[in-house]
Amino acid sequence: MGPRARPALFFLILLRTVAAQGRPPRSHSLRYLFMGASERDHGLPLFEALGYVDDELFVAYNHESRRAESRAQWVLGEAHSQLWLQLSQSLKGWDHMFIVDFWTIMDNHNHSKESHTLQVILGCEVQEDNSTRGFWKYGYDGQDHLEFCPETLDWRAAESRALTTKLEWEVNKIRAKQNRAYLERDCPEQLQWLLELGRGVLDQQVPPLVKVTHHVASAVTTLRCQALNFYPQNITMRWLKDRKPMDVKDAESKDVLPSGDGTYQSWEALAVPPGEEQRYTCQVEHPGLDQPLTATWEPSLSNTLVTGVISGIAVCVIIFFIGILFRILRKRQASRGAMGDYVLGECE
């Protein structure tokens, strides 16, 4: 596998894990994204970490600085607190663990000369009823590789080439118990602390702006439902036909993406038969909405005017040609009548 740039790695992890695994309304999450490269010729350090609370970046760390740096205003005053120091120590420990794991995986693949990448996502989710779910996953060279199972203290291999590492790690029961303790105890406690710090910021809810647009290309009519400027990012979008839910395979969806201003955006497209656009409705659910929001495509006034003008011109043209045809027929009839009178006069 060739070198990968920093943005490609980041979005690989973010889109395949955070965006793909949307959270239920009123849940909260703490996620750490680790990434690194065996060679330094493509913009990635040996280890880099990003921490997110409810999709909000709050901390960054890399192998060169070995320092946790705040990335959100609501944690700036915590740089010298005991909990922040504990977080910094955890990141330093993960730095060392990541590098050891990286070399282990490369050795088990007999990879030593080429440039390779390792990605890790770990963290927890806390639901409204205080139930928790932990996750700890590894990706190697951009592909799912290993996943930790806290219930059984073992590892699940996502591909056959991960089996050697799986068996090697499962021998170390102490590490497995430490992983489970973090996911089930330390991570939820850390999340609660961060939620308290971010109160008023992390608990804000911005409802989406929803609109449906109409596109025609290559004789295919497509309706696109756009949800813009919403927060948090967990959102549900679906198409209804005659007010009834449709099969999701009929629609083309876009991952939830950041808008660049702290909010998110997404869209869902559907190909429809021409002339039946009004039978389709886009339904959107979001924590910022009291009830599901629906939207349909409404032809713009300009389109209506253009259609009306074209129709009017067509009618006028038809009437004009009918008038000309009528006058021609009348002239022909008049000419035939005059000719008949002339012939009769000759006979007399």
From Swiss-Prot:
Residues 207-296 form the Ig-like C1-type domain. Residues 206-297 are annotated as: Alpha-3. It comes from the Eukaryota. It is found in: Cell membrane. Disulfide bonds join C124-C187, C225-C282. It is a single-pass type I membrane protein. InterPro entries: Ig-like_dom, Ig-like_dom_sf, Ig-like_fold, Ig/MHC_CS, Ig_C1-set, MHC_class-I_related, MHC_I-like_Ag-recog, MHC_I-like_Ag-recog_sf. Residues 331-348 are cytoplasmic. Keywords: Cell membrane, Disulfide bond, Glycoprotein, Ion transport, Iron, Iron transport, Membrane, Signal, Transmembrane, Transmembrane helix, Transport. The chain crosses the membrane at residues 307-330. One of its GO terms (cellular component) is external side of plasma membrane. One of its GO terms (biological process) is regulation of iron ion transport. Residues 298-306 are annotated as: Connecting peptide. Belongs to the MHC class I family. Binds TFR through the extracellular domain in a pH-dependent manner. This is Hereditary hemochromatosis protein homolog. It comes from Ceratotherium simum (White rhinoceros).
